């Protein structure tokens, strides 16, 4: 457990670069998931970082739940075997950490009076029931981490101020239309590790959202879901059962710059599919069943990283990665992985990688027979 003085000190340093875990927020996640900068929030008026503590009322230092650690406006009640949300939480609390307990239900008045709460951590409890008004008092809540619980549905009536929702590793099978209604500031949703199938997403389930980041990994998807927010910059669908990428699958995601499709069963990527991703910088297709390098990579002028290791690729053509000729303007690759494929790497022509910054950026080897 982090010392409380360290938690408080790191609170001020939590404005990390986009999609990188930094300092304070590391303690809330144990699965290496990337963290979003508050400046990525789609509603500029919502925040530019951690709330201004000086603008809040004086701290109620005498109020601290039994067994918890309270300092500044951080209340840490993790790893205490709690069965319910504790009482006597200071009304000026901005971060409440309740992870690693035995809480099974969130009741109507559990968070009453916590109108300044910015982040709520409920990871790794036994929550299966949430009152429809449980989050009503949390008018300034921006980060809700409720992963690794027993939820079978996305909680109703989430605060309209919410920017980031981590709800992975639950038992959710359905995302109904309207469940995210009114969440115009939502920027990041992590919902992997749920038994979601393609049929579990109702048409219009993501209507109104302007997400930057979405992860639905380790689910039961057999294809790229339709009608995801077209504002996405990052989409991670790794560890699913996707078998093919068809022409129309990526049509609406022209703003993507990172696409994760590793650890699926992809055998075919239809020609022209990748042409809808003009801003793509990073493509993960490792651990699939591809027999050739996908067509269209040379036309992605911003693409810099391609993971193709652990597939069934038998041949790499001289124009598979780079445009024909040397005068075509494009970003240089700084990472291409092709190891663990049945391609004789000694037969690949050196000119194949003429648009790579450094030969060390090319990962061959581990020849797979």
UniProtKB/Swiss-Prot annotation:
Propeptide: 17-37
Listed Pfam families: LRR_8, LRRNT
Any one GO CC term of the record: extracellular space
Glycosylated residues in this chain: 42, 48, 271, 312
Tissue expr: Found in several connective tissues, especially in articular cartilages.
Family: Belongs to the small leucine-rich proteoglycan (SLRP) family. SLRP class I subfamily.
Disulfides per UniProt: 64-70, 68-77, 322-355
Name of the protein in question: Biglycan
Subcellular location: Secreted, Extracellular space, Extracellular matrix
Keywords, sorted A to Z: Disulfide bond, Extracellular matrix, Glycoprotein, Leucine-rich repeat, Proteoglycan, Repeat, Secreted, Signal
Mapped LRR repeat ranges: 83-103, 104-127, 128-151, 152-172, 173-196, 197-221, 222-242, 243-266, 267-290, 291-313, 314-343, 344-369
SMART domains: LRR_BAC, LRR_TYP, LRRNT
Gene that this sequence comes from: BGN
Role: May be involved in collagen fiber assembly.
Record PTM: The two attached glycosaminoglycan chains can be either chondroitin sulfate or dermatan sulfate.
Quaternary structure, from the entry: Homodimer. Forms a ternary complex with MFAP2 and ELN.
InterPro entries found in the cross-reference section: Leu-rich_rpt, Leu-rich_rpt_typical-subtyp, LRR_dom_sf, LRRNT, SLRP, SLRP_I_decor/aspor/byglycan
Top-level taxonomic group: Eukaryota
Record's signal peptide: 1-16
